[in-house]
């Protein structure tokens, strides 16, 4: 009987230690349970997400699925609570945040360029000034051999061919970045078209998603449009040098996109990087964000699901994940932005208690 009592005490002691350890390291024990995370939204960062999602699944066993349905779709999916997190290139402004079912946070994940892509076989190195961009996209310049284009591109044999503007037909963060830039460089654009995820276009034809716009430009000689840089590089579509705020013509590159983010980043990371004051910056650059609810206990959502979500996002802004960005022509987050993202993630709760320490 004495031996049995001692054995019982020993078992109780180890059980208590194990219990205490699990409470202290609840995040680790919960993370061992395999879950599936579902996300949807922006097509702008989709090549990067597809790559790093596979890496994370291989390393942890956590399954991730992503639907590239545009930033507008990503915001709607989070609003309807049909995804673990949404993705958008256009941050939610104060009015939109107030309309959401509960508090939403933004996690920047990568930096990218919206390039001006065109299809003129054999004619590389096109330079587009602010004035030319305005007149082309407002429909005032309709031919590639317009005198203003020729004057700005000495040495290029621009053809007598109609310009066909290809734009997005769906709600798009890429459109938001592009139109935010256009609104900064052109009062005419700001007054008549403005900025947004969906616009009333003065000219052009629509295509769905970055893949749709890229494909249409590639198939249409004389076409011009705006797409995420990776889509242009992957399909070998020509891109223009764009005039920045210092008057310099800059190509989209990892370096020139990173230069656009040299300014101060606010604590909530909601900032547009277009038309940066840095003289070496590519002017149509931007963050892309993951959005999620700050309180994760909603609609019967389990703590395991919530913990898996924030653990993945914590990894996504880590050096390991950021180090993969350049493989698909994105720029990694500046150190300051990554640190702010990690701080924001530590505010995410389940039943009011932080999920990450």
Describe the role of every protein-language-model region.
Residues 18-357:
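Flexible loop/hinge segments at secondary-structure junctions
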Residues 13-16:
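C-terminal motif of bacterial Sec signal peptides marking the signal peptidase cleavage site
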Residues 1-4:
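Positively charged n-region of N-terminal signal peptides that target proteins for export
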